[in-house]
Amino acid sequence: MSERTLPDDLVELGRVASAYGVKGWIKVQPHSAQADVLRAAKQWWLAATPKSAPRVYAVQQCRVHGATAVAQLEGIADRDQAEALRGATVWVSRALFPAAAEDEYYWIDLVGCAFYSSVSGSDVRVGVVEEVFDNPAHAILRVVCQDAEGKALLDAKGRAREMLVPFVSAHIQAVDIAARRIDSDWPLED
């Protein structure tokens, strides 16, 4: 364990579920089905509570174990030390993520992108991607609808209007992470 400057691009990727074995390994429940980022990162930041500052740990070894990842962290040498980390959130710097394959995206990169629809042949800015979540078939974008000034459009009950859009090639025409833009042919809702 060491003290380093806290990166400003930390992304929460999982939670320590328990100790694993007697040699200080921990078992991490990832927030997504893929533990590739956890396995590839050589540094993790762990936060014991939501209000505590994360502390950096060097990852000595990590491997996928079913739906979890198990890891050995520098400075954690026995089961008691590993058990003390139970419940801690696991964070990784976005800069340490491996490059995504072509036409694949990290969900964290999609959040905040402007969402456009081109149903009638012209691009219309619908809103901003607020969240990405999974269903059994594919990922879903939750888009908060906005006016031309970027203010949320409200429904009859005063709540922000939203659209749920399947993140599939049949409806998503282009994704430009650098420009923070997603183009689609998803129909506009009235």
Swiss-Prot record:
Subcellular location: Cytoplasm
Residue span(s) of domain PRC barrel: 102-190
MF terms (GO), sorted A to Z: ribosome binding
Keywords, comma-separated and alphabetical: Chaperone, Cytoplasm, Ribosome biogenesis, rRNA processing
Function field: An accessory protein needed during the final step in the assembly of 30S ribosomal subunit, possibly for assembly of the head region. Essential for efficient processing of 16S rRNA. May be needed both before and after RbfA during the maturation of 16S rRNA. It has affinity for free ribosomal 30S subunits but not for 70S ribosomes.
Listed NCBIfam families: 16S_RimM
Domain remarks: The PRC barrel domain binds ribosomal protein uS19.
Protein name per UniProt: Ribosome maturation factor RimM
Organism ancestry: Bacteria, Pseudomonadati, Pseudomonadota, Betaproteobacteria, Burkholderiales
Gene that specifies this protein: rimM
